[in-house]
């Protein structure tokens, strides 16, 4: 069931949180899929007589869940989507009452179905047939076997699949969670993906408001829900509990809209219960909201460091897949071959599309990196001060270059030019005590290396140039002058 009335409430009161998007927006993204929900949909197709209906094997067992999963998974791969399938584990103890009610409704539906069949009411037969659906362990194992042949990752949740999907999404292992149950948001799913069913309308984007969008893929963002409703996560959980969930009863007379108004006024369930008239709004005996709140905040899940190694896609086992589908499930051989060819093509297409997207993104990043930021024009005073600073720095740099050159030459026992400044000569005298008798007038281009001298070996003698290197500040000056000129033009 999920959360009663939540989707419509969000469409009316937080419309920006629901975005209709095309399936192409999921290209290259990982998504966690509530597999149990999909199996239920495929089994319902039998009763509704849709494309997967009335499919059985030689034993008379329905195979619509296998055919439906094969078809939709193939479409996912063709769309460049990487699915991670998550299956339900043992239900929480608090869900026991809800499961009992479901069993009772199923028994009642079976009785109504028999009556409808007796009178031949086709519409009523379809309606009651859907209500009798129960996913068996055998059907779940069939789907897992199929996905194993396809090389898809499957995860068995210790409890609720929606909670495990939310955990994957919160830790960034998947982009979003594919499910129709709104309680995935209550478990903290940052992004819920609804109606990913590849129907004709699922890839159409309309201008209709979220409340009027019955078809088409929807992206629901939890952060936008909280900001639009102006509540925090704890209050959102309380809103879901008051609206009606699978884990406790509901308070008569309080639906989603009323619950929201009460939360805005009283902030939490504890304060609400103290202020409402419990004669008009009686509290049911199974309304243990504190335990339910804790379940939503800290559900039983496998931590991602325990299961992240399971999220791997492997190459399909085509031969085993074909043998199982054709021989054991009585699938048409030509149809199976067609699926296999589509999967092979989709893998090549997805790889190339992702590669093209990578290079396109990298190219844009390089382009953006080399864009020259706009500079404000310099005032006349700033221009004058800049020129003075450059001239002063350049003058100091010339002296520094000559002195450093002298020090290097003296240190290595090489002759020194007599054109050095007096200050440079003083610095040289202080640092050349080891060679006091060396003449300073020997020309550089007539140096003869002493091969026997340890200080003049090829390895440790620096190369000498007759021309002093250009002072390092000259390029800086040219650049600054160019900037000033550009400013003048502006």
Curated annotation (Swiss-Prot):
Binding site residues for Mg(2+) 1: 34, 88, 160, 162
Localization (cell): Nucleus, Nucleolus; Nucleus, Nucleoplasm; Mitochondrion
Protein name: Flap endonuclease 1
Pfam family, one: XPG_N
Post-translational modification: Phosphorylated. Phosphorylation upon DNA damage induces relocalization to the nuclear plasma.
HAMAP family membership: Fen
Annotated spans, Disordered: 364-396, 421-490
Function: Structure-specific nuclease with 5'-flap endonuclease and 5'-3' exonuclease activities involved in DNA replication and repair. During DNA replication, cleaves the 5'-overhanging flap structure that is generated by displacement synthesis when DNA polymerase encounters the 5'-end of a downstream Okazaki fragment. It enters the flap from the 5'-end and then tracks to cleave the flap base, leaving a nick for ligation. Also involved in the long patch base excision repair (LP-BER) pathway, by cleaving within the apurinic/apyrimidinic (AP) site-terminated flap.
EC assignment: 3.1.-.-
Positions with a binding annotation for Mg(2+) 2: 181, 183, 246
Principal localisation: nucleus
Biased composition (Polar residues): 430-442, 455-469
Taxonomy, superkingdom: Eukaryota
Chain intervals for the UniProt region annotation (N-domain): 1-106
GO CC, any one term: nucleoplasm
CDD domains per the UniProt record, alphabetical: H3TH_FEN1-Euk, PIN_FEN1
Region (I-domain) location: 124-266
SUPFAM superfamilies membership: 5' to 3' exonuclease, C-terminal subdomain (SSF47807), PIN domain-like (SSF88723)
Organism of origin: Cryptosporidium parvum (strain Iowa II)
Gene Ontology terms: biological process: base-excision repair; DNA replication, removal of RNA primer
Subunit-level organization: Interacts with PCNA. Three molecules of FEN1 bind to one PCNA trimer with each molecule binding to one PCNA monomer. PCNA stimulates the nuclease activity without altering cleavage specificity.
């Amino acid at each position: 069931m999920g959360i009663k009335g939540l989707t419509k409430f969000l469409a009316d009161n937080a419309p920006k949180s629901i975005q209709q998007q095309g399936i192409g927006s999921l290209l290259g993204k990982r998504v966690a899929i509530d597999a149990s929900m999909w199996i239920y949909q495929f089994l319902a197709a039998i009763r509704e007589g849709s494309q997967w209906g009335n499919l059985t094997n030689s034993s008379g067992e329905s195979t619509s869940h296998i055919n439906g999963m094969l078809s939709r998974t193939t479409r996912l791969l063709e769309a460049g989507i990487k699915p991670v399938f998550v299956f339900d584990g043992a239900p929480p103890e608090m869900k026991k009452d809800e499961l009992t009610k479901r069993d009772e409704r199923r028994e009642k539906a079976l009785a109504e179905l028999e009556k409808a069949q007796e009178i031949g009411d086709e519409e009523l037969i379809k309606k009651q047939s859907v209500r009798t659906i129960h996913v068996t362990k055998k059907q779940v194992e069939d789907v897992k076997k199929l996905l194993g042949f396809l090389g898809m990752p499957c995860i068995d949740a210790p409890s609720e699949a929606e909670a495990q999907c939310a955990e994957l999404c919160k830790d960034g292992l998947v982009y979003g969670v594919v499910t129709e149950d709104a309680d995935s948001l209550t478990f903290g799913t940052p992004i819920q993906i609804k109606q990913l069913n590849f129907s004709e309308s699922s890839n159409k984007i309309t201008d209709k408001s979220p409340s009027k969008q019955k078809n088409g893929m929807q992206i629901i963002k939890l952060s936008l829900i909280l900001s639009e409703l102006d509540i925090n996560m704890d209050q959102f959980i309380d809103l879901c509990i008051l609206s009606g969930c699978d884990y406790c009863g509901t308070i008569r007379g309080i639906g989603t809209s009323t619950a929201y108004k009460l939360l805005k006024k009283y902030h939490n369930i504890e304060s609400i219960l103290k202020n409402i008239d419990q004669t008009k709004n009686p509290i049911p005996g199974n309304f243990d909201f504190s335990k339910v709140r804790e379940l939503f905040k800290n559900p039983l899940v496998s931590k991602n460091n325990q299961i992240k190694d399971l999220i791997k896609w492997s190459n399909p086992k085509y031969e085993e897949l074909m043998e199982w589908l054709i021989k054991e499930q009585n699938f048409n051989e030509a149809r199976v071959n067609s699926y296999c060819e589509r999967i092979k093509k989709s893998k090549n297409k997805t790889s190339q599309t992702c590669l093209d997207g990578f290079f396109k993104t990298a190219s844009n990043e390089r382009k953006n990196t080399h864009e020259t930021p706009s500079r404000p024009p310099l005032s006349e005073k700033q221009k004058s001060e800049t020129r003075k600073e450059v001239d002063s720095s350049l003058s100091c740099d010339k002296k520094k270059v000559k002195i450093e050159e002298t020090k290097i030459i003296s240190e290595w026992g090489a002759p020194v030019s007599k054109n050095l400044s007096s200050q440079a000569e003083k610095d040289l005298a202080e640092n050349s005590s080891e060679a006091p008798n060396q003449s300073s007038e020997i020309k550089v281009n007539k140096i003869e290396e002493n091969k026997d001298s340890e200080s003049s070996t090829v390895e440790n003698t620096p190369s000498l140039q007759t021309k002093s290197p250009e002072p390092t500040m000259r390029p800086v000056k040219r650049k600054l002058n160019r900037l000033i000129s550009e400013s003048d033009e502006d």
